[in-house]
Every structure is written in structure tokens, then in C-alpha cells.
């Protein structure tokens, strides 16, 4: 796969390359190619904000609805349990997501990309006890010891080659990291497609070219 990656890099200069690297095996090559290596781990200086959103895409599906769906799935992972989120919990999460993105959706100049903590704080404002249950589960990832996803994005996600390293994560945190990584990859592929750019995605030694 590394040989194919290098071949794509050298022969198809317009294409983008995205790598999800569980063991950090691709990181040295990506650095040599001048790409962006992002190490997702507690204490890492690199951060991807799961609340990032691309609102200006001319797509069939609303970016806000897609982000709400992603955050519902994220909260489901965080809350856990065999039954997942209950209908009322899904309703209050969806409501809060739309509230915290309201300024961005309206195109206000003062609008800022929210953080996970903004969702947490909005949940605490809701009257339903179910909202507090979800907020309590999120607390660990906002103000607790696993707050690595509660930061603004500080890496170049638009680099031609991006390698996300998931080495050193526990099982639960790895599931959340993979969910956030998959959301980034899906979003990047969509943006690239709209710009007429093909994307090569590498997961666990398997590659797939996205051209649509």
C-alpha cells in the first residue's frame, strides 16, 4: 500500500490522500512527503474538532442534518449501554445541535465553530432529565481527563496528504476516535468531489479510491 500511495503522490498530483493509521506505520513516509501527520492521543498537541462543519456545500442533504446525525451517533457511543439513546434523548440532542449552530447557519459574522463543550453546556440548559444524563456522559470528554476532542482544530486538514495516527488509544477512546475520523474522511471526500478532486483513502492496509 505504501508503494501505491507513493505512486499516486508522484503521478497524480491533483489527487488527495487520506490515511487512517492505527500503528503509526505511515507517519514517517507522510512527513517525508510534506504531509500532515495528526496523532490522536491524550496529551497530543494535535486536535481535530468533531464540531467542525462545512455549511456552504451545494449538496442534496443539509450539512446541519448530517452533523446532527453524526453527533447523535457520537453521543450514542459516549452514553453506551445495550439500548443506546432513547427517543427523548435523541430529540434533545438534535435540538441542542441546532441551537449551537444557529449563528453559523444564519451566516452571522460573529459566529464561531462550537466545541463539544458547547453541546455539553447546551444540554445542561434543557429541562428534560434525559438531557442531563447525556451531558453527564459527555462530561468526561469535555472537562474530564479525556478532553482531547474538546479543542479547536489546529492541524491542516486541507493538506494534500493527511495521516491520522490512532496509536496508543484505549478501546473506548479508539471507537470514538474512529467515529470522528470517519466523519472527517467522509466530509473531505465530499468537498473534494465538489471540487473535482479524487481522494485515495487508506484504512488498515486497504485502499479505496473515491471518485464520486
PLM features: what roles do these ranges have?
Residues 1-42:
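Glycine-rich phosphate-binding loop of nucleotide-binding enzymes
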Residues 27-35, 42-44, 49-208, 212:
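P-loop NTPase motor domains
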Amino acid at each position: 500500500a505504501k508503494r501505491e500511495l507513493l505512486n499516486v503522490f508522484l503521478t497524480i498530483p491533483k489527487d488527495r490522500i487520506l490515511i487512517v493509521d492505527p500503528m503509526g506505520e505511515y507517519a514517517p513516509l507522510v512527513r517525508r512527503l510534506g504531509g500532515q501527520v495528526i496523532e490522536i492521543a491524550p496529551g497530543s498537541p494535535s486536535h481535530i474538532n468533531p464540531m467542525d462543519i462545512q455549511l456552504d456545500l451545494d449538496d442534496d442533504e443539509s450539512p446541519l442534518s448530517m452533523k446532527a446525525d453524526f453527533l447523535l451517533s457520537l453521543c450514542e457511543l459516549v452514553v453506551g449501554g445495550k439500548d443506546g439513546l432513547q427517543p427523548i434523548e435523541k430529540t434533545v440532542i438534535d435540538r441542542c445541535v441546532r441551537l449551537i449552530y444557529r449563528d453559523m447557519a444564519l451566516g452571522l459574522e460573529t459566529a464561531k465553530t462550537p466545541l463539544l463543550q458547547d453541546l455539553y453546556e447546551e444540554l445542561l440548559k434543557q429541562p428534560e432529565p434525559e438531557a442531563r444524563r447525556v451531558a453527564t456522559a459527555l462530561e468526561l470528554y469535555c472537562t474530564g481527563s479525556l478532553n482531547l476532542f474538546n479543542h479547536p482544530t489546529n492541524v491542516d486538514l486541507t493538506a494534500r496528504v493527511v495521516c491520522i495516527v490512532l496509536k496508543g488509544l484505549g478501546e473506548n477512546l479508539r471507537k470514538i476516535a474512529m467515529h470522528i475520523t470517519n466523519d472527517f474522511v467522509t466530509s473531505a471526500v465530499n468537498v473534494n468531489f465538489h471540487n473535482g478532486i479524487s481522494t485515495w483513502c487508506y484504512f488498515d492496509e486497504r485502499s479505496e479510491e473515491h471518485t464520486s
